[in-house]
């Protein structure tokens, strides 16, 4: 498992965790121009250090136990964050006629829904085991920042250029690999065992592979300043949405201030 939050892991550049992955995890393609890899590695490091990723709430949650109400709020908001993402990612496919990009998009979505149980089913099982059932979720009103996050991601993936959409997805998948590791730490601190935390542990490596898929898709297209500007717009618009989301969750749950 590629844990990005251990002291050992922080002693080396973050992109090394993406260059050297566990068997069965999507690997990066070899890039002929070393400057392209250096650029994408640098963007990965900028994503990893962004406040939306190194958020005070997430860092506090790693070592702060929540009461049942706080826990319900946190994971109900996560449900409304995650639930439609595979559909939005699939919508990116109509923007391109490049089979490499199409393949990488399909591989990411296939990880989520291509086998039984699907990852959304695993997440629903996790929620049920901590006392959050479908009836609760159907009646739950998420924060406005959570609605804005969902709408913003849908817009980025389905209504912007392919370069900008891939920038957002690179930020999404890279951020997610770190976020799920922090949440897994918090759940472990809460006293939950490996079996209950399976969804989160699974995604630590899965999201690294998903980030690598986006690396493979975008690498041929970030040679120019104009393409990089579009790509970076997507990266930082996505991270801004996530930062505001965690700010809202922090206020709701009441830790990490």
UniProtKB/Swiss-Prot annotation:
The name this protein goes by in its record: 4-chloro-allylglycine synthase
Q: Which GO terms describe its biological process?
A: antibiotic biosynthetic process; L-beta-ethynylserine biosynthetic process; L-propargylglycine biosynthetic process
Instruction: Please tell me where Fe cation 1 binds in this chain.
Output: 112, 119, 203
PANTHER family according to UniProt: 4-AMINOBENZOATE SYNTHASE, PQQC-LIKE PROTEIN
A Pfam family of the record is Haem_oxygenas_2
Reported consequences of knocking out the gene? Cells lacking this gene no longer produce detectable amounts of L-propargylglycine and L-beta-ethynylserine, that are terminal alkyne-containing amino acids produced by wild-type S.cattleya.
Biochemical pathway: Amino-acid metabolism; Antibiotic biosynthesis
The enzyme's first-digit EC class, named in words, is oxidoreductase
Q: What is its EC number?
A: 1.14.99.-
Q: Where does Fe cation 2 bind?
A: 112, 173, 207, 210
Which gene carries the instructions for this protein?
besC
Query: What function does the entry list?
Result: Involved in the biosynthesis of terminal alkyne-containing amino acids such as L-propargylglycine (Pra) and L-beta-ethynylserine, that are produced as antibiotics by S.cattleya. Catalyzes an oxidative C-C bond cleavage in 4-chloro-L-lysine to form 4-chloro-allyl-L-glycine (also named L-2-amino-4-chloropent-4-enoate), with release of formaldehyde and ammonia. Is also able to react with L-lysine directly to produce allylglycine in vitro.
Sorted keywords for this record are: Amino-acid biosynthesis, Antibiotic biosynthesis, Iron, Metal-binding, Oxidoreductase, Plasmid
As to how many cofactors bind and how, the note says: Binds 2 Fe(2+) ions per subunit.
Known catalysed reaction(s)? 4-chloro-L-lysine + AH2 + O2 = L-2-amino-4-chloropent-4-enoate + formaldehyde + A + NH4(+) + H2O
List the cofactors. Answer: Fe(2+)
- From which source organism is this entry? Streptantibioticus cattleyicolor (strain ATCC 35852 / DSM 46488 / JCM 4925 / NBRC 14057 / NRRL 8057)
Example of a GO MF term? metal ion binding
Family matches, as NCBIfam families: ChlAlygly_Syn_BesC
